[in-house]
From Swiss-Prot:
It comes from the Bacteria. One of its GO terms (biological process) is rRNA methylation. It is found in: Cytoplasm. This is Ribosomal RNA small subunit methyltransferase A. Belongs to the class I-like SAM-binding methyltransferase superfamily. rRNA adenine N(6)-methyltransferase family. RsmA subfamily.
């Protein structure tokens, strides 16, 4: 079998062979350290009884490692120029299918049903996500309720910090809540910028998201819950009252009544959003939802 793709020499050889030029608009940075790939598949707990969806295979470095350890791999690639390269670099593996398309526009459940020979096997999602589209992809996968046991992503370290953050830290925010509401989040390890070609400006990190059996808190209306959390972080230095009154002007004439009701459930409107944990945000949104419906 040919030398691993994830080395500086082999990557350069492949790119030269096909005259491939990186597209900055697609955030293309290819891994050139096979040790990192092994750590990613170990973190994702890939086995021969696992199906994997990969997003953004590039020239196939991570795909190759996944193919060695998984039952089947289906990879979404948006850049048509990479399709013939992937045909070449992954030709030794009969358990890989590459789907040309944008995962943000795809019906992922349909792809699972059509592309995997055994769609009933446990599914995991693994990706080296382009920085510019990280958040939209993760939120789409969550909101579409894709039946994945876990998701393991390599992404910009700053975003990984935000996803895995805890309350009362500068990284904690609406993105933290949007993901941790459904998933347990663990920052697995840091990936230095030096192991990519071309080298990005910042370090990356691998984050492992494991689906909770039930959402972290009980809410009456999930859409409204996320609306409240986003509003609470609209201006981080402002209090809950300032942010919520700006988002929901109907609260202003009833401030005293609102303060009294929220104090009764242990939430003080002079706090900042970053100090509330997810169960507290659930209590806040449930109360607000009922409060705003009252005449």
């Amino acid at each position: 079998m040919s030398k691993d793709i994830a080395t500086p020499g082999r990557t350069t050889e492949i790119l030269k062979k096909y005259g491939f030029l990186f597209k900055k608009s697609l955030g293309q940075n290819f891994l050139i350290d096979s040790n990192i790939l092994t750590r990613i598949t170990d973190t994702a707990e890939i086995t021969k009884e696992t199906n994997v969806i990969e997003i953004g295979p590039g020239i196939g470095a991570l795909t190759e490692q996944l193919a060695k350890t998984a039952n089947e791999v289906v990879a979404f690639e948006i850049d048509q120029r990479l399709l013939p390269i992937l045909d070449d670099t992954l030709s030794a593996y009969n358990n890989v299918k590459v789907v040309h398309g944008d995962v943000l526009k795809a019906d992922v459940e349909e792809v699972i049903a059509e592309q995997f020979a055994k769609p009933e096997l446990p599914l995991k999602i693994v990706a080296n996500l382009p920085y510019y589209v990280t958040t939209p992809i993760i939120l789409k996968l969550l909101h579409d309720n894709i039946p994945a046991d876990s998701m393991t992503f390599m992404l910009q370290k700053e975003v990984a910090d935000r996803i895995s953050a805890v309350p009362s830290t500068k990284s904690y925010g609406s993105l933290t809540i949007a993901i941790q509401f459904y998933m347990e989040a663990e920052l697995a390890f840091i990936v230095p910028k030096t192991v990519f070609m071309p080298q990005p400006n910042v370090d990356s990190a691998v984050i492992h998201l494991k689906r909770r059996k039930e959402p972290l808190a009980e809410v009456n209306d999930e859409e409204f819950f996320f609306e409240v959390t986003r509003a609470s972080f609209a201006q981080r230095r402002k209090t809950l009252w300032n942010n919520l009154a700006s988002k929901f002007p109907a609260l202003k004439p009833r401030k005293d009544e609102l303060v009294e009701g929220l104090n009764a459930i242990g939430i003080d409107l002079i706090r900042r959003g970053e100090t509330l944990d997810i169960p507290e945000f659930a209590k806040l949104s449930n109360f607000l939802g009922d409060f705003l419906k009252e005449k």
